[in-house]
Amino acid sequence: IRDVKIKKSFPDTLEIIIIPQQPYAIYNSKIMTIDGTVIGASSMQLDLPIIIDHTNDSQSSMNTMILTSKLLKKIDLDIKKIEIHDSIIKVFTSANILISDRVNYENNLNRLVVTFHDLQKLFKREIKSIDMRYSNGFAIK
């Protein structure tokens, strides 16, 4: 529950309005809401992307998740899990694993979005992982 409003509407009537939290991702085994708030773990089985953050910076992780989701939608990839380390970020998608250094993460994702469909045509087999840590291209498995 994010908020509760209680109003007295008639001499003996109370109006209670409950505003629920909206879960966005699983963050280090807890729930991250759509506004970036981290709340306690849920016993319910939720089908949400997972963020494993070894830097323990929930706000930065939320920003990384939003950026990644926005860019990967352009190439029809869904995020299953993101692992954020001090120097690298690993994104596990519905189809493959993406690896990037943190410093150039946004630039690397943008390069991938521009070239992804060409890579799929060039490699006529399934691409398991794309390492974007190289400034002049990608390492593809």
Where in this protein do the model-derived segments appear?
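Membrane-embedded segments
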Residues: R2-P20
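Residue-level signal for well-ordered alpha-helical segments
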Residues: I1, S9, Q59-S61, T68, ...
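Extracytoplasmic segments of membrane-associated envelope/inner-membrane machinery
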Residues: L14-L98
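Extracytoplasmic/luminal low-complexity segments enriched in Pro/Gly and acidic/polar residues
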Residues: V103-K141
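Short secondary-structure junctions
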Residues: R2, K70-D78, Q120-R125
